[in-house]
Design a protein with these regions (language model features):
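Intrinsically disordered, low-complexity linear regions
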Residues: 1-105
């Protein structure tokens, strides 16, 4: 049996693009993201600080939401992801590592 493991690293800047391009309940993508903080887990989460019209807001995004957003973002960017693969997320400094493990053959 052969196992393939891939790691997709989402930098802090790329995470901003994720939240501006993939819909997330409770977050308006038109808001200007001022800060993204990766909170180490387990499981990891993200705190988004944003502002619009003079008002500031902070939103905590849990790991199950992050996984859904990352899969949607990869689809949008045409990054292939096997459906049946094991997918995990972990913090890597101020970035997130999206790991995909699948069994081949």
């Amino acid at each position: 049996m052969i196992t393939e493991i891939r790691h997709i690293i989402f930098s802090n800047d790329e995470l901003k693009l994720v939240f501006q391009s993939v819909p997330l309940e409770g977050f308006d993508p038109a808001r200007r993201i001022t800060r993204i903080q990766v909170v180490e887990g387990p499981p990891p989460s993200i705190r988004i600080q944003s502002e619009a019209g003079g008002g500031r807001a902070e939103l905590e995004v849990e790991s199950y939401q992050l996984a859904r957003l990352m899969v949607a973002y990869c689809r949008e960017k045409k990054i292939p992801l096997p459906k049946d693969a094991l997918k995990t997320i972990h913090a890597q400094g101020d970035a997130l590592c999206f790991s995909i493990m699948s069994t081949l053959g």
